[in-house]
Regions:
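Soluble or luminal CAZymes and related metallo-dependent hydrolases
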Residues: 21, 111, 291, 295
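Short, solvent-exposed secondary-structure boundary motifs
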Residues: 25-43, 103-115, 183-191, 220-227, ...
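A short, structural micro-pattern
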Residues: 23, 113, 120-122, 255, ...
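A broad, low-specificity signal marking well-ordered, structured residues that form hydrophobic/aromatic
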Residues: 26-27, 40, 49, 117, ...
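Short, positively charged
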Residues: 18-22, 273-275
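C-terminal catalytic domain of Rieske-type non-heme iron oxygenases
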Residues: 134-345
Length: 345
């Protein structure tokens, strides 16, 4: 595997210093179940990638053949690697060329290997880090209950949002918009007040426990929580763009949603949403996919029309209200990581 200190692509939409900070973090680029057979194309931080699985190992590399620059995603998969469609060069599990059809038996030049990146397969997702320090790799975000007995693992289809990842994540953390945006899925338009809550800083970002009477049953459902039941929503923010939400239902039922916002560019985000739950295990996963997408779709218009498109980390640039505690903690966390005052505008 060839690894180098990466530099932003020529067409990069990020500030170069912000790009490098993001490149040092883990981001999801595909669902693991989708990496089987033909090479898969993905884009992360404006870098075009090829993803393939060979001999049980997942490879994430720049989507370019080092011979004549053809995208390897135009090629095909064989037992021993992926094959460039131009001259038939084949690249194996370590990213090295292992066949040159036009020169059988000849030494293979050392330059014929892919620029590949660190890979982790977790929570049903393929994660990569474009600038991973092998001696000090960054921690991968964690997801509560994913491996716990009795919990069903669900991985919803990915989808794209035409907006900045930071804006989308901030919306996921926001608890004041439920009664205005999510009334067709789970929220009550008459339940608008936001009780006090206090985010707590952690080594990976922050956590916040939000107690309220806002339920999480589908609006069309006949099920209701017991009278006076208080719902706990436990948020864990893993900077920069991955958050989890654990919702405590009646009778010790739990629903965990990971909101993993993968920055395709500074203006496009690919969303991944693993889910774990210990109830309604008889319900088809397709129904879970559909409901989860409906909730995300309710947020889409807000995220895609916010101005500025980036996330102002200078807190004096926008007004704030008491319900914005998580939003403020998020922006402060990004600022502490070193991102610019006017992040990715």
């Amino acid at each position: 595997m060839k690894t180098t200190t990466p530099t932003p692509p020529a067409h990069c939409t990020f500030d170069p210093e912000d790009w490098l900070r993001l490149a040092r973090c883990w981001h999801p680029v595909a669902r693991a179940c989708d990496i089987d057979g033909a090479p898969v194309k993905a884009t992360l931080l404006d870098e075009q990638l090829v993803i393939y699985r060979i001999k049980g190992q997942v490879v994430v590399a720049r989507d370019v053949c080092p011979h004549r620059g053809v995208p390897l995603t135009l090629g095909f998969h064989e037992e021993e690697g992926i094959v460039c469609p131009y001259h038939g060069l084949r690249f194996g599990e370590d990213g090295r060329c292992n066949r040159i059809p036009s020169s059988p038996g000849q030494p293979i030049p050392a330059k014929l290997h892919l620029t590949s990146f660190a890979v982790e397969e977790r929570y049903g997702l393929i994660w990569t880090c474009l600038a991973c320090d092998p001696d000090n790799p960054p921690p991968l975000p964690t997801m509560p209950h994913w491996d716990d007995a009795g919990f069903q693992q669900i991985n919803c289809p990915a989808f794209e949002v035409k907006g900045f990842a930071g804006r989308q994540v901030e919306g996921f953390l926001d608890v004041a918009h439920f009664a205005w945006i999510h009334t067709d899925t789970f929220a009550d338009p008459d339940n608008q007040q936001v009780p006090d809550y206090t985010p707590q800083e952690t080594p990976f970002g922050f956590v916040a426990d939000y107690w309220s009477s806002v339920g999480n049953y589908p609006a069309s459902s006949d099920f209701r929580a017991p009278e006076g039941f208080q719902w706990l929503r436990h948020f864990e923010m893993h900077l920069p763009f991955t958050a989890t939400l654990t919702i405590h239902f009646p009778a010790d039922a739990r629903l965990v949603i990971m909101n993993a916002a993968s920055p395709v560019s500074s203006r496009v985000t690919r969303m991944f949403a693993p889910i774990a739950r210990n109830f309604d295990l008889h319900v088809p996963v397709e129904d879970v996919h559909a409901f989860n997408l409906r909730v995300f779709e309710e947020d889409r218009l807000m995220v895609e029309t916010q101005r500025p498109g980036g996330l102002p980390l200078d807190l004096t640039l926008e007004a704030h209200i008491p319900a914005d505690r998580s939003s403020i903690a998020y922006r402060r966390g990004l600022k502490k990581m070193g991102f610019g005052d006017f992040f990715l505008v």
